Amino acid sequence: MANRNDSKNRRNKDDIEDQLVAINRITKVVKGGRRQRFAALVVVGDKKGHVGFGTGKATEVPEAIRKAVEAGKKNMISVPTVGTTIPHEVLGHYGSGNVLLKPAEAGSGIAAGGAVRIVMDMAGIGDVTSKSLGSNTPINVIRATIDGLQKLKTREDVLKLRESAKSLQD
């Protein structure tokens, strides 16, 4: 497994950037020898509150990356933000991977490692603290981070939930 965090961001005409997280070489043993394919893991986002990820497999690396970018664009989510940080603390979970995300003061930057940092950067979140708990496999960490971002609620959402719960009690 090779991390490719140093790859350049590519801009598309719809203003969505993509960042390559990992490329894995997959080998299938067949009667005639070994067949090699590549699996790419890509995070896409517009740095304005929208982020997604995708995986792609192909016999050539560029084709795997293209497939991953297309898959990432199809499952983008919207992330609520307060300034340059997240509204509240949240724990994202996927498989055996857990990611704790905490809001941070303006100017403190992204205190996160590896895959979480890439997701936060692509979402446009500039100030956040995170801790990866459990699995450190990039795909599990990204899925747990996306799960945590999906669980975020804005202040208005919480007020609406409280009002609806209050009206049900009356």
Curated annotation (Swiss-Prot):
Residues in S5 DRBM domain copies: 16-79
Keywords assigned by UniProt, alphabetized: Ribonucleoprotein, Ribosomal protein, RNA-binding, rRNA-binding
Top-rank taxon, per record: Bacteria
Coiled-coil region(s): none
Function description: With S4 and S12 plays an important role in translational accuracy. Located at the back of the 30S subunit body where it stabilizes the conformation of the head with respect to the body.
Assembly, per entry: Part of the 30S ribosomal subunit. Contacts proteins S4 and S8.
Name of the protein: Small ribosomal subunit protein uS5
Primary gene name: rpsE
